[in-house]
């Protein structure tokens, strides 16, 4: 994975550098910035986890696409705060929250869903 690909996926998932560094790379934010700048190579395990998260996002989108195909206009929860998300999803973490935000924002901005 190139540095630009890493940054593109991180931004698509709505993760900031510190969140990605802590929860995916388990490194300092500075190390993550080195990967994104191209100063250091992206480790294979980080590449795989980012690709896995992008796949999870696609699965989430597929579930919404099925609802749309059935004629439903989904109402998607957009959590402003991590604490709100965790109250409804206690087994998740910041990564799940950001994935949820990413998908909800996409469908809302494309006019396919309402946010609640």
From Swiss-Prot:
InterPro entries: Aca2_YdiL-like, Lambda_DNA-bd_dom_sf, YdiL_sf. Pfam families: Aca2_YdiL. Changing residue 33 to A: Loss of regulation by Aca2 at the transcription level. DNA binds at residue 34. The N-terminus HTH domain is involved in DNA binding and inhibition of transcription. The C-terminus is involved in dimerization. Represses the expression of the acrIF8-aca2 operon. Regulates the transcription and translation of phage anti-CRISPR acrIF8 gene (AC H9C181), which is necessary because the expression of this gene rises rapidely upon infection to enable evasion from host CRISPR-Cas defense but is probably toxic to the host cell. Aca2 repressor can inhibit acrIF8 transcriptionally through DNA binding to 2 inverted repeats in the promoter region and translationally by binding conserved RNA stem-loops on mRNAs thereby blocking ribosome access. This is Aca2 repressor. It comes from Pectobacterium phage ZF40.
């Amino acid at each position: 994975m190139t540095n630009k690909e890493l940054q593109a996926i991180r931004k698509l998932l709505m993760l900031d550098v510190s969140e990605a560094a802590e929860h995916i790379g388990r490194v300092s934010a500075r190390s993550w910035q080195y990967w994104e700048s191209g100063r250091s190579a992206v480790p294979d395990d980080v590449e795989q986890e980012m690709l896995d998260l992008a796949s999870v996002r696609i699965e989430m989108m597929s579930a919404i696409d099925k609802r749309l195909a059935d004629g439903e206009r989904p109402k998607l929860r957009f959590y402003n705060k991590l604490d709100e998300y965790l109250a409804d999803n206690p087994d998740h973490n910041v990564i799940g929250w950001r994935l949820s935000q990413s998908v909800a924002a996409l469908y809302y901005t494309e006019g396919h869903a309402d946010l609640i």
